[in-house]
Regions:
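Glycine-rich phosphate-binding loop and adjoining helix at the ATP-binding site
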Residues: 1-70, 102-105
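Glycine-rich beta-strand-to-loop/alpha-helix junction loops that act as flexible
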Residues: 2-7, 75-78, 189-195
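Basic, gly/Ser/Thr/Pro-rich low-complexity segments located predominantly at protein N termini
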Residues: 7, 11-12, 81-87, 165, ...
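Short regulatory "switch" loops immediately downstream of catalytic or recognition motifs
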Residues: 37-38, 85, 104-107, 132-139
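Glycine-rich phosphate-binding loop of actin/hexokinase-like ATP-binding domains
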Residues: 59, 64-127
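A mobile "lid/hinge" subdomain adjacent to the ATP/sugar-phosphate binding pocket shared
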Residues: 113-177, 184-190
Length: 195
């Protein structure tokens, strides 16, 4: 079984993952660290490999293109990133660009997990869409979950609503300004974007 998930995984064990932000340290150690190992055993005690979702994105891109130097970014609930170097290797680097600051404005949104301001997760994810909705003239029901709010904006965009489309254009502009920052750290030949 191949499992891709946000976070840091060592020997198929969850070492650090914002997915489990609200889980206490005690419960994390007891229930989360071996969550995927236990899931594999429940399915039938079959071989399993857990990898960072961003690395899987980049590897899929390398396989599809038959090339290397790929930075893969998936924008969804968060911002996942992975890299396949010019030698065709998944580097094992900590590619959590979700927590890379991209906005130095003192009033930038604070990421609740890292405590940093202006992190990519707040711009290249559902949080970014929700943040831009009021400026685009879209009111979202506060009782909705973040995923439900995103679906409202996505439906508007799919229906051709210019206000909703402007949100995605703005996120594209953010990304255009951020890619050169990423290129300072990664030798990018191809950029694979999902989300």
């Amino acid at each position: 079984i191949g499992i891709s998930s946000a976070g840091i995984y060592v020997d198929n064990r969850t070492m650090l993952a914002s997915l489990f932000l609200k889980v206490s340290k005690e419960d994390f150690d007891k229930k989360v660290k071996d969550i995927y190992i236990r899931a594999g055993k429940e399915i039938g005690d079959v071989p399993l490999l857990v990898a960072n979702d961003g690395d899987v994105t980049a590897l899929a891109g390398a396989m599809e293109l038959g090339d290397t130097g790929i930075l893969g970014i998936a924008m969804g609930t968060s911002e996942a990133a992975g890299y396949v170097d010019r030698g065709g290797n998944v580097t094992g680097w900590l590619n959590e660009l979700a927590f890379c600051p991209i906005d130095a404005n003192a009033t930038a949104m604070v990421d609740e997990w890292s405590g940093d301001i202006g992190c990519g997760v707040k711009y290249f994810s559902q949080d970014g869409v929700i943040k831009l909705a009021p400026a685009a003239g879209i009111e979202l029901d506060e009782s909705l979950s973040p995923a439900e709010k995103l679906k409202v904006v996505q439906k508007l965009a799919n229906d051709g609503d210019e206000h909703a489309l402007d949100i995605y254009r703005t996120i594209g502009a953010y990304l255009a300004h951020t890619i050169p920052l990423y290129a300072d750290c990664y030798d990018i030949k191809h950029l694979l974007l999902l989300g």
